[in-house]
A protein has these predicted regions:
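Conserved "landmark" site that anchors the functional core of diverse proteins
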Residues: 1-289
Length: 289
């Protein structure tokens, strides 16, 4: 096909196609999905003159390899890994050349963008894979990835030498204290339990994934009754009976019955997403500016 662009040689620890996610389907129980770190993904696209929400490949940690099927430009962002191409800048790739992502050093999710954006089937208006819901699938060795649309490849002018501002590059090993807004049941926790949450250094557990990030630390000793299930959004912080907070992520449930301590600021969801298992994170009350 004229728009075939990359072949998956080795999928590594796993990857999917993701864009900015699907909107308007939560009431039917369909989560938004989409990129875990929209800051990194949008920068990879902008470097190539793509729209910020163009479809990218999202990769977990390390080990993926791709072969170019034709000349094109790519940009890689997000979690830092040893690679045979530089990060955070447009890179020309010739047909037959390989892109190899090796050992991970910081962060959890890496993004591979191609000039024009990746194509593929849409589900409810989005190409974002939601594997648990049978919308799209994880990448497999041998998969052929296509460019969006069928237009001939045209390498954009003036992109060689581009990079992102240094202030936009994040040190994923040292996230800031993440901002939290009040949630509908925040008042149920009272001042003592809320202060405990903000004063505790929490650890991201190995069970954390695209559905939710589970945190370990000194439990919030708060034994509330289960509530009626009600809508939750990406970034909702729920506290189950064991006192260990769970933060809803992109593939998370659309309703939940645990008390909601707070809502992670949308700009900080990407920061939390890049925290690896075992990494520590702190939170702070968000304030109006």
């Amino acid at each position: 096909m004229a728009n075939e662009v990359l072949r998956v040689v080795d999928r590594g620890l796993g990857g999917t196609l993701q864009d900015q996610g699907r909107r308007g389907w939560r009431k039917y129980g369909v989560p938004p999905s989409g990129v875990m770190d929209d800051h990194a993904a949008s920068w990879a696209n902008r470097l190539l003159d793509n729209s910020a929400g163009a479809t990218v490949v999202e990769l977990l940690l390390q080990g993926a390899k791709f072969e170019a099927l034709r000349n094109t430009w790519v940009a890689i962002s997000g979690a830092e890994v040893d690679a045979n191409v530089p990060f955070w800048r447009p890179v020309p790739v010739k047909a037959g050349e390989r892109i190899e992502l090796r050992q991970n050093h910081s962060g959890r999710w890496t993004y591979l963008a191609v000039e024009g954006g990746f194509g593929g089937p849409e589900f409810f208006g989005s190409r974002s894979a939601y594997v648990r819901g049978a919308m799209g699938s994880a990448l497999a060795d041998g998969d052929v990835l296509v460019k969006q649309g069928g237009k001939p490849f045209q390498l954009p002018d003036g992109i060689a030498g581009r990079t992102i501002p240094s202030l936009e590059r994040r040190d994923y090993n040292h996230p800031p204290a993440l901002k939290v807004w009040p949630a509908p049941q925040s008042e149920l926790f009272g001042r003592r339990h809320s202060e405990h949450f903000f004063e505790t250094t929490w650890t991201v557990t190995p069970e954390s994934d695209r559905v939710g990030y589970r945190l370990a630390g000194t439990p919030i000793e708060f034994p509330p009754d289960r509530l009626l299930s009600e809508p939750v959004r990406v970034g909702t912080i729920q506290v189950p009976e064991n006192g260990m907070p769970i933060v809803t992520m992109r593939d998370g449930p659309t309703v939940g019955g645990y008390p909601k301590l707070g809502m992670l600021d949308p700009s900080d969801v990407s920061w939390l997403a890049q925290c690896r298992p075992g990494q520590q994170v702190r939170f702070q009350p968000a304030r109006e500016t």
